[in-house]
């Protein structure tokens, strides 16, 4: 349940911030972790495909077409825009971060699907 997952990860993050506790989460739905993740280890076929700060590991995942769908949707959009438009966008943790970058770069979102 998405609301339960969001609440759980927020609680775990609050514990981390309050007590400085290291938290290790195994999660396939990265969208839930996006606001909180700091570092990430990505496994592919039992091998480490990326191990770094989230902002450094995510582009490595994006380059691998098998791993790309596992990225949070917001970062799939971000990295796709950076690739297509040769931009260096911020480290989006929320839709508000994305909208702020859109405003900064004059990107206008239109309804429908971009191909």
Segment roles from a protein language model:
Residues 115:
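Flexible loop/N-cap segments at domain edges
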Residues 2-4:
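Helix N-cap at the start of a conserved alpha-helix in ABC-type nucleotide-binding domains
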Residues 41:
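Conserved catalytic/dimer-interface elements of ABC ATPase nucleotide-binding domains
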Residues 33-35:
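A short, surface-exposed alpha-helical micro-motif characterized by mixed small hydrophobic
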Residues 47-74:
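Conserved beta-strand-loop-alpha-helix hinge in the C-terminal portion
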């Amino acid at each position: 349940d998405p609301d339960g997952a969001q609440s759980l990860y927020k609680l775990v993050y609050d514990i981390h911030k309050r007590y400085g506790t290291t938290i290790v989460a195994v999660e396939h739905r990265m969208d839930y972790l996006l606001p909180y993740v700091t570092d990430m280890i990505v496994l592919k076929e039992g091998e480490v495909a990326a191990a770094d700060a989230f902002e450094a590991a995510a582009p490595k995942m994006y380059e691998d077409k098998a791993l790309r769908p596992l990225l949070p949707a917001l970062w799939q959009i971000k990295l796709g825009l950076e690739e297509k438009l040769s931009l260096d966008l911020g480290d989006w943790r929320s839709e508000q971060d994305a909208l702020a970058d859109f405003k900064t770069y004059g990107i206008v979102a239109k309804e429908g699907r971009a191909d």
